[in-house]
């Protein structure tokens, strides 16, 4: 199965595009929207590119959550990051709680803030822990 992936790189931190060309490896066939807000990027991608997966960073407020909901409702999977101290704390934020209650994400990966992003825990779409092997 072929995966059509897209990346919304709002601040240029993920793909580090120079003259429209990603300098970091984001996948050979990944469409990158550089410098475009999620609120503009998600609808544009859904209408024009029909990706299976949309990657974006740092969800924070209600507008970001609405973008994820729009992508999810149109059948696209979303890969996103959120800064937080624990899954429960993040899931209970008013702006993001609807994403968790509707189970918009299949997997939650918790990373340590120390040691270069070491995986500290995995949780399924219901928030149940998945053992690390």
Where are these regions (language model features)?
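Switch/connector loops and helix/strand junctions flanking conserved nucleotide-binding motifs
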Residues: 14-17, 88-90, 116-120
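Short, low-complexity, polar/charged sequence segments that are solvent-exposed and flexible
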Residues: 24-27, 98-100, 127-131
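P-loop NTPase switch/communication element
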Residues: 1-45
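A broad, structure-centric signal for solvent-exposed, well-ordered loop/edge residues
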Residues: 39-40, 66, 97, 129
């Amino acid at each position: 199965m072929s995966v059509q992936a897209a990346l919304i790189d709002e601040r240029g931190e993920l793909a580090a595009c120079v003259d429209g060309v990603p300098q970091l490896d984001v996948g050979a066939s990944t469409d990158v929207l550089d410098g475009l807000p999620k609120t503009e990027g998600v609808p544009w991608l859904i209408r024009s590119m029909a990706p299976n997966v949309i990657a974006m960073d740092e969800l924070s407020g209600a507008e970001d959550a609405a973008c994820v909901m729009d992508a999810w409702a149109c059948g696209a999977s979303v890969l996103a990051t959120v800064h937080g101290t624990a899954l429960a704390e993040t899931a209970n934020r008013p702006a993001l709680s609807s994403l968790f209650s509707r189970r918009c994400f299949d997997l939650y990966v918790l990373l340590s803030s120390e040691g270069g992003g070491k995986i500290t825990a995995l949780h399924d779409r219901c928030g149940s822990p998945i053992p690390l092997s």
